[in-house]
Amino acid sequence: MPLFTANPFEQDVEKATNEYNTTEDWSLIMDICDRVGSTPSGAKDCLKAIMKRVNHKVPHVALQALTLLGACVANCGKIFHLEVCSRDFATEVRSVIKNKAHPKVCEKLKSLMVEWSEEFQKDPQFSLISATIKSMKEEGVTFPSAGSQTVAAAAKNGTSLNKNKEDEDIAKAIELSLQEQKQQYTETKALYPPAESQLNNKAARRVRALYDFEAVEDNELTFKHGELITVLDDSDANWWQGENHRGTGLFPSNFVTTDLSTEVETATVDKLNVIDDDVEEIKKSEPEPVYIDEGKMDRALQILQSIDPKESKPDSQDLLDLEDVCQQMGPMIDEKLEEIDRKHSELSELNVKVLEALDLYNKLVNEAPVYSVYSKLHPAHYPPAAAGVPVQTYPVQSHGGNYLGHGIHQVSVAQNYNLGPDPMGSLRSLPPNMNSVTAHTVQPPYLSTGQDTVSNPSYMNQSSRLQAAAGTAAYTQPVGMSTDVSSFQNTASGLPQLAGFPVAVPAPVAAQPQASYHQQPLL
């Protein structure tokens, strides 16, 4: 079953209110009234179809729809009365009257409302009609009095009046045709009048179209609003025979007017208006490039805020255009927001990376500096010895190897001298010639001054006073040979005995001034 079904009354209502109808089809109207009670939603569907035709732009259609509405109210009973007294119907009536429809349509609708209020005044269920009339009167809408219901009476008695008028028109047409036939037989004139008289008659019987008419049958004539039509036969009050540039045929007489003087100017103005409208439509049909314009959005919001919601005026064309343009901006605004969001995410990630880099930099700056191991291996400066004074020999040995000062003879010492916790790997990076003893020239050892204040006993006293006091011959030790000092007694008074470790005894040399030396490690 489809979601949206067609209104079952729409086709019959359109047929009963066709713009080409010259009279009301009461048989069809009564058939519609009979069908209203056959379905549960018949009254609602019928009223909806009728009000759709009441809002038609052709006044003839709206008047026929109001006639059908009055017939349904009079013949369909309470089920239709409840629909007429509903809020939806009251809103439709307000829109028809306030939108300045055709005056005849408004007057007929007002008269029907007054008539229904008089009929329903005893039933409180139908009080909405009277309340609607009262509220519209307060708004300035005028309604006819209850005693002068001419239009409503005409709507009720429309059948008899229209039928009588139709009978009279037919009788007149028959009379005229009989008279013409008698004249043709009695007169001796030519069957066809001269061409000049035909042209004059045509010029004298021209009418102007008030509405557009589209031919449905083959014998009908099609014309547009404002066109001139030559009347060939107007014997029938409702359908005339005429001719224009499209051909010859029948057309409804209420679609034309015989007043040609005032319509000439209006026709030219209408043509100009049509041309202007066409130009505007062409301009509007060319779509302008749409882009995000904050000014247009602000202007649309300003217009919307300035509108009073209580007013029932239609929206201006400027507002409609701005709303259309703003709606077209929607997808572009969404794309722009997505792009901004993406850039924001990228910048946020970049900001995090920059902060991490700055944090790492600050951490490295605040850490204790790591000095190179070579900075601790710089040579230590020793003060030069006094001239003519023997210099004491300081043998030094590390746990990783023997260390001798520059120009010092190699001695084997049991005492260890630690240079600190420096890694030995850094010392092994020195040149290999620093680790060889034979690569250096043997120098005589430094001699001390023979003072008792020396704290380290591992040195050798070469004072001449020791030899004189001992009274023994000096023992000459070959240069470069190691000797065991423990087997000898130190004859110096007040000096402790030497420890038992080998010491190299050099040949006596003259005291010379000693330059400062630098201690270098040997591997």
From Swiss-Prot:
Q: Give GO cellular component annotations, separated by semicolons.
A: cytosol; early endosome membrane; nucleoplasm
> Chief location of this protein?
cytoplasm
Q: Where is the UIM domain?
A: 165-184
Q: Domain of life here?
A: Eukaryota
Q: Which residues form the SH3 domain?
A: 202-261
Q: What phenotype has been reported when the gene encoding this protein is knocked out?
A: Adult mice lacking Stam and Stam2 due to inducible gene targeting exhibit significant reduction in T-cell development in the thymus and profound reduction in the peripheral mature T-cells.
Residue segments, region Interaction with HGS: 334-368
**Which stretches does the entry tag as region Interaction with USP8?**
219-220
According to the entry, every stretch annotated as the VHS domain falls at 16-144
Q: How is it modified after translation?
A: Phosphorylated in response to IL-2, GM-CSF, EGF and PDGF.
Q: Which UniProt keywords apply?
A: Cytoplasm, Endosome, Membrane, Phosphoprotein, Protein transport, SH3 domain, Transport
Q: Sorted alphabetically, which PROSITE patterns does this protein's record hold?
A: SH3 (PS50002), UIM (PS50330), VHS (PS50179)
Q: Where are the transmembrane segments?
A: none
- UniProt cross-references to Pfam families, sorted A to Z: SH3_1, UIM, VHS
- Residue numbers covered by motif PxVxL motif: 54-67
Molecular function (GO) terms listed?
Answer: phosphatidylinositol binding; ubiquitin binding
Listed Gene3D superfamilies: 1.20.5.1940, 1.25.40.90, SH3 Domains
How does this chain sit within the bilayer? Peripheral membrane protein
Per UniProt, residues of the ITAM domain are 360-377
Q: In which tissues is it expressed?
A: Ubiquitously expressed, with highest levels in testis.
Similarity annotation: Belongs to the STAM family.
What PANTHER family does the record tag this protein with? HEMATOPOIETIC LINEAGE CELL-SPECIFIC PROTEIN-RELATED (PTHR45929:SF1), JAK PATHWAY SIGNAL TRANSDUCTION ADAPTOR MOLECULE (PTHR45929)
Q: What is known of its domains?
A: The VHS and UIM domains mediate the interaction with ubiquitinated proteins. The SH3 domain mediates the interaction with USP8.
Function, in words = Involved in intracellular signal transduction mediated by cytokines and growth factors. Upon IL-2 and GM-CSL stimulation, it plays a role in signaling leading to DNA synthesis and MYC induction. May also play a role in T-cell development. Involved in down-regulation of receptor tyrosine kinase via multivesicular body (MVBs) when complexed with HGS (ESCRT-0 complex). The ESCRT-0 complex binds ubiquitin and acts as a sorting machinery that recognizes ubiquitinated receptors and transfers them to further sequential lysosomal sorting/trafficking processes.
The record's subunit annotation is: Component of the ESCRT-0 complex composed of STAM or STAM2 and HGS. Part of a complex at least composed of HSG, STAM2 and EPS15. Interacts with JAK2 and JAK3. Interacts with ubiquitinated proteins and the deubiquitinating enzyme USP8/UBPY. Interacts (via the via the PxVxL motif) with CBX5; the interaction is direct. Interacts with VPS37C. Interacts with ubiquitin; the interaction is direct. Interacts (via UIM domain) with UBQLN1 (via ubiquitin-like domain).
Could you identify this protein by its name?
A: Signal transducing adapter molecule 2
- Source species, please? Mus musculus
